[in-house]
Amino acid sequence: MSVTADDVRRIARLARIAEPTDRIDTLVGELNGILSWIEQLNEVDVDGVEPMTTPVKFPLPQRADEVTDGNCRDKVLANAPKSDEGFFVVPKSVE
């Protein structure tokens, strides 16, 4: 599979970005290079290899689940543009 200049224009239109008229030839080459690299990855034999998220296994520290109130209401409300009696004040969204 190879990318053409028309494909680059179509991708730009679908992504709703400005058509890169001065860089189309460069982008065609870059996208074809990426696709070539992906085709090389498809040739790797992975039969018998278990899917994994990381090659290094390290357990995450475990802790007991405890319900708390967070003790940071004032800090959180300090970030709000408007608050009243400990609650966020937002514009009315339903009539």
From Swiss-Prot:
The keyword Protein biosynthesis applies. Pfam families: GatC. Its EC number is 6.3.5.-. SUPFAM superfamilies: Glu-tRNAGln amidotransferase C subunit. GO terms for molecular function: asparaginyl-tRNA synthase (glutamine-hydrolyzing) activity; ATP binding; glutaminyl-tRNA synthase (glutamine-hydrolyzing) activity. InterPro entries: Asp/Glu-ADT_sf_sub_c, GatC. GO terms for biological process: glutaminyl-tRNAGln biosynthesis via transamidation; regulation of translational fidelity; translation. Heterotrimer of A, B and C subunits. PANTHER family: GLUTAMYL-TRNA(GLN) AMIDOTRANSFERASE SUBUNIT C, MITOCHONDRIAL. This is Aspartyl/glutamyl-tRNA(Asn/Gln) amidotransferase subunit C. It comes from Maricaulis maris (strain MCS10). The gene is gatC.
